Structure formats: C-alpha cells, structure tokens
Amino acid sequence: MKKIIIMAGGTCGHIFPGLEIAKSLINKGWKVFWLGTSKNIESKIVPKYGITIKYINISGVRGKNLFELMAIPFKLIIACYQAKKIIENINPDIILGMGGYVSVPGGIISYLYKKPLIIHEQNKIAGLANKLLSKFTTINMQAFANTILTSKSITVGNPLRTSITNLKKSWDRFENRSGPLRILVVGGSQGTQIFNFCFPKVALVLKNKIKLWHQIGKKNINIIHKLYDIHNNLAIYKITPFIKNISKAYFWADLIICRAGALTVSEIQYIGLPAIFVPFPHKDQHQYWNAYPLKMIGGAKIIMQERFNVNVIITLLKNLNRQKLIVMAKKLRSSYKLNSIKTITKIIENITH
C-alpha cells in the first residue's frame, strides 16, 4: 500500500482541496496521512474523514511583533525536527503541500530526505510557503496558469467538492425562471461587514425587484436583522449566519456577490454562476487576480472595496436581467476545462509508479 502525507492547515482554502485529493487516493487504495497543527481547524475537520493526522508546532508570520518574529527561526527548527520524526515513522512514498506555513517544515525535511515533494497552489498569486518550496519540488501544481513560473509547473485547477461538480449547468437551473432576480450574498463564514450594512439599504431601494439570500456571519446578528426589517416590508430576503449547504445556495441563485477566495472563484466558474466580486484588499491583491480571468471572459464583474457602496451595487443590479446572466453563465462554464482531481491523482501515481 502506497502512502502519502498531505500538509495543509490554517484555512479551509488549503484544507478542503487537500481532502478531495485524499478521498480520490483512498479510493485507489492509498494510505493517507495528514500533517497539521493541533490549534487550527484541520484538527477538527480532518479526523472526521477517517484520516490519521499528525501535529507539529508552527505558526504564521503575519501579525507578529518584533519579538515573535525573532523567535521564528528557533520555532522552525523545532517544527522541522517534529516533521522529521513523523516522516521517518510513516516513510511516505510522496509528500504533498497545499500551501500555508504548516507545509514548510515537512517540505524542508522531504527535500533533505530526498522524498518526492509536490505542491498545489490554489491562488493566482502564490503564497510565501509555496514560493519557497517550489524550488525543491518534483512538480508544482497550480490552479491558474503562470502562477509559479518554473519548468516544473503544471496547471491543474482547484479540486472541487462532488456536491459542486454534481450541480446542473447554470442555464439548466434558471433559464425558465421568472420573477425577481435571486441574489446570493456571501461574505465568508465570518460575514463581511461592508456587505452587512450595504444590502439592507439595497433591499430598501430595489424592494421586490430582487430576492436576497444573505450570509451575514455571527457578528452583529441582531443589528443586521433590524436593518433589514426597518422599512423593508416589500423586500424579499432571507438572512442566515452561515450557509451549511452552499451547493443548495448556488443552485438557488441567479447571481452571487462575494469575496474572491480561490475555491469560491473556481466553484463559481465550474457551475457557471455569474458573480460580482469584491476582493478582500490583501497586500498582494491575490483575490483580485483570482477573479480577474472571470472578468476578462465576461462572466463576472469586480468592484474594489474602496469603490463598493450602495449606489454602485444598485446601478449594477438595475442593469442585469436573466438573459444577460445566462450569457455570463455560459461563458463561465465553457471556460472551465480542467478535471483537477483526476489530473492530480494521475500525477501522484505517475511519480510513485
């Protein structure tokens, strides 16, 4: 039985693509191990899939003060020693890094022990960990073309959940719909405050011309409820702290307004759901560049956060109808040609053949 260690943690954007790859390999008879940290969400998510998870002590560099930054080299040495013990014990045939700081110690040790190392970068702009490890890999897999500029790079897309890939094509979902446009507003699991305070006002102006399904997060729930309730008797809306079944929400929607995380962008492109992206203003603007290809093919629009306001959204929505959205949807879906999980699985099998 062949063995793989998947290194991923910290955010769902690293973890869930790794889990889809893990499920594919398990179905082919592989034994999958996971390398993460005990303090982050991978410690709660990964064991639910029956995958053995091993822990190292490591944290990221963002938001650290000078004293904490000075301690990082020592912590990295400790984490590398922990990763060394884990890799020696498991003796994997290959190691896969999904990005994020947790993949760095294992990546370093895999190189020193001459274990095949491959990485997957979900974003259009590569993260620091993958930039570092890309110099020591057998293959660099990337969701977007020209992200990691080496001869070892292969564009494979992002691994998507089966609940997403099983959805009907967008024009089959809403071609025969009538009535108000169905608009899904998603600000991430924590909500997005600029969305939360904008869309009650949008509902007030557009009233029954739209239907809103708004994921508001857990902050200020009562305030947001009151904002929607005030003067919005004619508006049609549903608000919830968190949407557990995002596939159901995608199926319902004609249009989504959201951030531009890598997985969200890939899911939207695959199912053909027209989008208005409001990229989070990271320093490297990676969310903008995630969304940019969809804008260029005519399947999405981008509003930078500094330009985002009620009037801009209302103007955009007034200029949209289902006929225009169907055209956008077809452009999105026809542009997605990658079978990511199948391709990644084959790459792993070929390297370890």
UniProtKB/Swiss-Prot annotation:
SUPFAM superfamilies: UDP-Glycosyltransferase/glycogen phosphorylase (SSF53756)
Coiled-coil ranges (or none): none
Topological category with respect to the lipid bilayer: Peripheral membrane protein
Enzymatic reactions: di-trans,octa-cis-undecaprenyl diphospho-N-acetyl-alpha-D-muramoyl-L-alanyl-D-glutamyl-meso-2,6-diaminopimeloyl-D-alanyl-D-alanine + UDP-N-acetyl-alpha-D-glucosamine = di-trans,octa-cis-undecaprenyl diphospho-[N-acetyl-alpha-D-glucosaminyl-(1->4)]-N-acetyl-alpha-D-muramoyl-L-alanyl-D-glutamyl-meso-2,6-diaminopimeloyl-D-alanyl-D-alanine + UDP + H(+)
EC class: transferase
Database matches in InterPro entries: GlcNAc_MurG, Glyco_trans_28_C, GlycoTrans_28_N
Presence of keyword Cell division: yes
GO cellular component: plasma membrane
Entry-linked Pfam families: Glyco_tran_28_C (PF04101), Glyco_transf_28 (PF03033)
Metabolic or biological pathway: Cell wall biogenesis; peptidoglycan biosynthesis
Enzyme Commission identifier(s): 2.4.1.227
Gene Ontology terms: biological process: carbohydrate metabolic process; cell division; cell wall organization; lipid glycosylation; peptidoglycan biosynthetic process; regulation of cell shape
Residues the entry annotates as binding UDP-N-acetyl-alpha-D-glucosamine: 123, 161, 189, 243, 262-267, 287
Localization of this protein: Cell membrane
Gene Ontology molecular function: UDP-N-acetyl-D-glucosamine:N-acetylmuramoyl-L-alanyl-D-glutamyl-meso-2,6-diaminopimelyl-D-alanyl-D-alanine-diphosphoundecaprenol 4-beta-N-acetylglucosaminlytransferase activity; undecaprenyldiphospho-muramoylpentapeptide beta-N-acetylglucosaminyltransferase activity
Keywords: Cell cycle, Cell division, Cell membrane, Cell shape, Cell wall biogenesis/degradation, Glycosyltransferase, Membrane, Peptidoglycan synthesis, Transferase
Function: Cell wall formation. Catalyzes the transfer of a GlcNAc subunit on undecaprenyl-pyrophosphoryl-MurNAc-pentapeptide (lipid intermediate I) to form undecaprenyl-pyrophosphoryl-MurNAc-(pentapeptide)GlcNAc (lipid intermediate II).
Assigned protein family: Belongs to the glycosyltransferase 28 family. MurG subfamily.
Protein's UniProt name: UDP-N-acetylglucosamine--N-acetylmuramyl-(pentapeptide) pyrophosphoryl-undecaprenol N-acetylglucosamine transferase
Species of origin: Buchnera aphidicola subsp. Baizongia pistaciae (strain Bp)
Gene: murG
